[in-house]
């Protein structure tokens, strides 16, 4: 349901609107705040860190600007809708630039694939690798479109609050191969092993193992082709700033350094929050954008809850992330905005990461060069980069205080030997984020990068619900609830609130 734009508020008297407290200022929390403000709530967003954005915060070092987390904007209409709820157009505040290609996928021997939304170009790329797989590729994309139509367009913003709602879609899940893994679905259409890798890697963008993630996530291929892959000029942080501006324009409040210690529950209902310093903030509803495991395991304290400690410990978490941010005193014009560098192993590496929780000697990498599109993110004649390696989450027991620098050096050597010659001698600034930082900064369970692993038994009804099963007037948004991680996922989780949160009733 698309709520109409809120009318300007009369600020001459006291604000009698019902109060909504949003815990966390990630994209899920910010989008929820905008939607609630548009529906008549007075909104307060509480962020424990010293800047907005959660995983989408911004690092500024030595004249370089680095987006900390999300860099790939798909389904931009989900952002545009938030601006329209406030009677504005996003294009007046944010410049989105389409990427062409979306990514360049590079294998160890130097063979590369330019992945884009151009149908003719994609057929030609597939034919370069395996001419006999072109018909299978076309059939796979038709399948992806069918899955996207149901899994994203029809169900992505629908709450799964009870078991019957899940049972109703079971026939669709079977018909669309939701019980198979993404890799298995791709392999039904495509025979060339490298092409199977190219068309099955997408679950890694939301923390999933292509060999275990539900085949429903094959929808990502069509989602990207339909709505494109974009970059926000100025960085993803510009989207965070834009949403914060919308919230303020609605009369909402954003507070940094506000560490929520617990959600106050009285008579089975959420009635506000208590900060670490002892301050109590009353609320009519509470929306948590915190990690769902932290919400249920810590913020609700001793409250009776279905997602109890034992259930949380049994759940499968997404992978961890090792991210190295660096700036160079030279430019690398031959490097695309988004590059995926595949290592020597695919299935074996993912087994090490997700099952064995072993930090392998080899790795696959995602390299982000935002200055390919926006040179102002670095000093003149310089480039800004971040490189991300999927790694085990903290269940693997790795000591990142000891392992981080040797691992970074191995990544640097791999980049220097492939796409960034002379890298070591060109570094101007350098720092890393590890799974331990995800646990410390974002209170992420097991230091995972994306919350729960996106497998079928942890999807839709099987995830923590958008409306708490245990506490009235408590709602969840973000990667840890339905529909899941990634920008389209967390923005859609806020969209679900339109169906489960009552409209504000303002006293006369």
PLM-predicted stretches and their roles:
Residues 106-213:
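Rossmann-like flavin
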Residues 219-276:
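Helical element adjacent to the flavin cofactor pocket in flavoenzyme catalytic cores
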Residues 2, 16, 261-379:
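Mid-domain catalytic core of redox enzymes
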Residues 1-21, 38-39, 455-462, 468, ...:
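Extreme N-terminal leader/targeting segments of oxidoreductases
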Residues 13-149:
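N-terminal glycine-rich phosphate/pyrophosphate-binding loop and immediately adjacent elements
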Residues 70, 479-501:
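A conserved FAD-binding loop/helix module that cradles the flavin
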Residues 329-437:
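C-terminal segments that line or cap access tunnels to active or ligand-binding sites in enzymes
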Residues 192-206, 360-366, 421-483:
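A glycine-rich dinucleotide-binding beta-alpha-beta segment and adjacent secondary-structure elements
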């Amino acid at each position: 349901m698309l709520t109409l734009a809120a009318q300007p508020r009369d600020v001459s008297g006291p604000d009698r609107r019902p109060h909504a407290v949003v815990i966390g200022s990630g994209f899920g929390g910010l989008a929820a705040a905008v939607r609630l403000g548009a529906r008549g709530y007075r909104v307060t967003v509480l962020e424990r860190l010293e800047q907005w954005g959660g995983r989408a915060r911004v690092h500024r070092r030595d004249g370089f600007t680095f987006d900390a987390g999300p860099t790939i904007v798909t389904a931009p209409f989900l952002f545009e809708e938030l601006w329209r709820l406030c009677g504005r157009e996003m294009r007046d505040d944010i410049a989105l630039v389409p990427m062409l290609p979306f990514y360049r996928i590079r294998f160890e021997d130097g063979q590369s694939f330019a992945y884009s939304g151009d149908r003719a170009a994609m057929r030609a790329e597939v034919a370069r690798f395996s001419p006999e797989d072109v018909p299978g590729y076309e059939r796979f994309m038709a399948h992806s479109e069918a899955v996207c139509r149901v899994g994203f367009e029809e169900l992505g913003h629908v709450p799964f609050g009870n078991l019957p709602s899940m049972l109703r879609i079971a026939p669709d899940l079977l018909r669309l191969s939701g019980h198979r893994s993404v890799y298995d679905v791709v392999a039904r259409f495509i025979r060339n092993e490298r092409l199977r890798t190219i068309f099955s890697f997408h679950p890694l963008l939301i923390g999933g193992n292509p060999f275990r993630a539900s085949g429903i996530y094959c929808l990502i291929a069509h989602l990207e082709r339909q709505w494109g892959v974009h970059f926000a000029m100025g960085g993803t942080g510009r989207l965070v700033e834009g949403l914060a501006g919308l919230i303020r324009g609605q009369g909402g409040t954003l507070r940094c350094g506000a560490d929520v210690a617990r959600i106050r529950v009285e008579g089975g209902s959420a009635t506000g929050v208590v900060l670490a310093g002892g301050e109590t903030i009353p609320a009519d509803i509470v929306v948590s954008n915190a990690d769902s495991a932290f919400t249920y395991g810590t913020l609700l304290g001793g409250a009776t809850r279905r997602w109890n400690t034992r259930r949380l410990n049994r759940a499968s978490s997404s992978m961890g992330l090792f991210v190295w941010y660096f700036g160079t005193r030279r430019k690398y014009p031959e490097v695309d905005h988004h590059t995926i560098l595949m290592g020597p192993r695919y299935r074996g590496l993912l087994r090490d990461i997700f099952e064995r929780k072993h930090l392998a000697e080899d790795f696959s990498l995602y390299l982000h060069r935002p200055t390919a599109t926006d040179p102002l993110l670095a000093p003149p004649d310089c480039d800004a980069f971040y490189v991300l390696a999927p790694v085990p989450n903290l269940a693997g027991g790795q000591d990142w205080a000891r392992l981080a620098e040797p691992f970074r050096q191995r990544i640097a050597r791999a980049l220097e030997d492939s796409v960034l010659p002379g890298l070591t001698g060109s570094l101007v600034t350098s720092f890393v984020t590890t799974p331990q930082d995800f646990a410390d900064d974002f209170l992420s369970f097991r230091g995972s990068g994306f919350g729960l692993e996106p497998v079928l038994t942890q999807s839709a009804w099987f995830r923590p619900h958008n409306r708490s099963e245990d506490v009235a007037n408590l709602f969840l948004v973000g990667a840890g609830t339905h529909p899941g991680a990634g920008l389209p996922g967390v923005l859609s989780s806020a969209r679900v609130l339109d169906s489960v949160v009552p409209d504000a009733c303002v006293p006369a």
